[in-house]
Amino acid sequence: MSQEVLTLAQDLISRPSVTPLDEGCQTLMAERLAAQGFEIESMVFEDTTNMWARRGKEGPLFCFAGHTDVVPVGDLNRWHTPPFDPVVIDGYLHGRGAADMKGSLAAMVVATERFVEKHPDHNGSIAFLITSDEEGPFINGTTRVIDTLEARNEKITWSLVGEPSSTHKLGDIVKNGRRGSLTGNLTINGIQGHVAYPHLADNPIHKAAPALDELARMKWDNGNEFFPPTSFQIANINGGTGASNVIPGALEVMFNFRYSTEVTAEILIQRVLNILDAHGLDYDISWIFNGLPFLTGDGPLLDATREAIKQVTGSDTDPQTSGGTSDGRFIAPTGAHVIELGPVNATIHKVNECVKVSDLELLTQCYEVILEKLLC
């Protein structure tokens, strides 16, 4: 097995790029891509480093998308090896970001190098959209780069996001869509008072409980063949002063929807407001739109991905829309077809994150075959 993808993955992991830091990861990638004829454009927005690299001027435009930032390491004492000192143990590469997603970044670069060497006059264009703000607040990362590209009418045809999509073996699952995400921050207003004199107070917890129960039990939709039913989850709830003899003056509730294409954010918001109003609550509420649902159906990108995985691994893949959000939510609204394909996700965001070394080579081969099927 070639060592080039492993070596690059180790070089990337050794840089402690805890979000929103990049720590030179994009420079390392840019140097490799520039040698293949890519034009490199650094886009820095506040604390976030982004890279747009493109080879070719014509369409169609295939774009690898990913992030160089990683989540914090957590308790260092629980790591078997230093998280930013990547080592191979029993066939697995250990280190923060090994699976999410520096292994994918290395595979993208090496696959592109191999493809360009074999097909220097390929059709269309290849691009890389890389950010250091995917694990953080996602304000100055991919969304800002997309805004820049849209402003100059630079359109992505197909995008492959290197998020760790696989579950048990490489390529068993690809993400061909994601649910939308909507967060609500709700404050139920009451009147603070002494618990011995409830008639002089107004307990917001008691008032809110029936409404929250109705929201939790509500069936928002039935989903469809591509998406599970919309889910509502209360993520945080806080009320009271910490004293046992004080009725609180307010109750704060944070909740989140992961919603299908059967509803819109506007529909969900109105249904929530109707329930709160029906219970006669005095409340304040604000909303955070985290991303719209998207779906990539049958077509060149999904077909190429299926065929590549079958050719490289010998197994069929299962396109799904489950799981959390990714930066694909910012790319899809431009009209691009978006697929996520990456390593097994069993250890992502955990201590002792790792990826199977042989999977890095298989992933590289998958990426290269996808390029060949789309641009040759």
Swiss-Prot record:
<keyword id="KW-0378">Hydrolase</keyword>
<keyword id="KW-0220">Diaminopimelate biosynthesis</keyword>
<dbReference type="InterPro" id="IPR001261">
    <property type="entry name" value="ArgE/DapE_CS"/>
</dbReference>
<feature type="binding site">
    <location>
        <position position="135"/>
    </location>
    <ligand>
        <name>Zn(2+) 2</name>
    </ligand>
</feature>
<keyword id="KW-0170">Cobalt</keyword>
<keyword id="KW-0028">Amino-acid biosynthesis</keyword>
<dbReference type="GO" id="GO:0009014">
    <property type="term" value="F:succinyl-diaminopimelate desuccinylase activity"/>
</dbReference>
<keyword id="KW-0862">Zinc</keyword>
<dbReference type="GO" id="GO:0019877">
    <property type="term" value="P:diaminopimelate biosynthetic process"/>
</dbReference>
<dbReference type="GO" id="GO:0006526">
    <property type="term" value="P:L-arginine biosynthetic process"/>
</dbReference>
<dbReference type="GO" id="GO:0008270">
    <property type="term" value="F:zinc ion binding"/>
</dbReference>
<dbReference type="GO" id="GO:0050897">
    <property type="term" value="F:cobalt ion binding"/>
</dbReference>
<feature type="binding site">
    <location>
        <position position="349"/>
    </location>
    <ligand>
        <name>Zn(2+) 2</name>
    </ligand>
</feature>
<feature type="binding site">
    <location>
        <position position="67"/>
    </location>
    <ligand>
        <name>Zn(2+) 1</name>
    </ligand>
</feature>
<dbReference type="InterPro" id="IPR050072">
    <property type="entry name" value="Peptidase_M20A"/>
</dbReference>
<comment type="function">
    <text>Catalyzes the hydrolysis of N-succinyl-L,L-diaminopimelic acid (SDAP), forming succinate and LL-2,6-diaminopimelate (DAP), an intermediate involved in the bacterial biosynthesis of lysine and meso-diaminopimelic acid, an essential component of bacterial cell walls.</text>
</comment>
<feature type="binding site">
    <location>
        <position position="100"/>
    </location>
    <ligand>
        <name>Zn(2+) 1</name>
    </ligand>
</feature>
<feature type="binding site">
    <location>
        <position position="163"/>
    </location>
    <ligand>
        <name>Zn(2+) 1</name>
    </ligand>
</feature>
<dbReference type="InterPro" id="IPR011650">
    <property type="entry name" value="Peptidase_M20_dimer"/>
</dbReference>
<protein>
    <recommendedName>
        <fullName>Succinyl-diaminopimelate desuccinylase</fullName>
        <ecNumber>3.5.1.18</ecNumber>
    </recommendedName>
</protein>
<dbReference type="GO" id="GO:0008777">
    <property type="term" value="F:acetylornithine deacetylase activity"/>
</dbReference>
<dbReference type="Pfam" id="PF01546">
    <property type="entry name" value="Peptidase_M20"/>
</dbReference>
<feature type="active site">
    <location>
        <position position="69"/>
    </location>
</feature>
<comment type="similarity">
    <text>Belongs to the peptidase M20A family. DapE subfamily.</text>
</comment>
<dbReference type="InterPro" id="IPR036264">
    <property type="entry name" value="Bact_exopeptidase_dim_dom"/>
</dbReference>
<feature type="active site" description="Proton acceptor">
    <location>
        <position position="134"/>
    </location>
</feature>
<comment type="subunit">
    <text>Homodimer.</text>
</comment>
<dbReference type="GO" id="GO:0009089">
    <property type="term" value="P:lysine biosynthetic process via diaminopimelate"/>
</dbReference>
<comment type="pathway">
    <text>Amino-acid biosynthesis; L-lysine biosynthesis via DAP pathway; LL-2,6-diaminopimelate from (S)-tetrahydrodipicolinate (succinylase route): step 3/3.</text>
</comment>
<dbReference type="InterPro" id="IPR005941">
    <property type="entry name" value="DapE_proteobac"/>
</dbReference>
<dbReference type="Pfam" id="PF07687">
    <property type="entry name" value="M20_dimer"/>
</dbReference>
<keyword id="KW-0479">Metal-binding</keyword>
<feature type="binding site">
    <location>
        <position position="100"/>
    </location>
    <ligand>
        <name>Zn(2+) 2</name>
    </ligand>
</feature>
<keyword id="KW-0457">Lysine biosynthesis</keyword>
<dbReference type="InterPro" id="IPR002933">
    <property type="entry name" value="Peptidase_M20"/>
</dbReference>
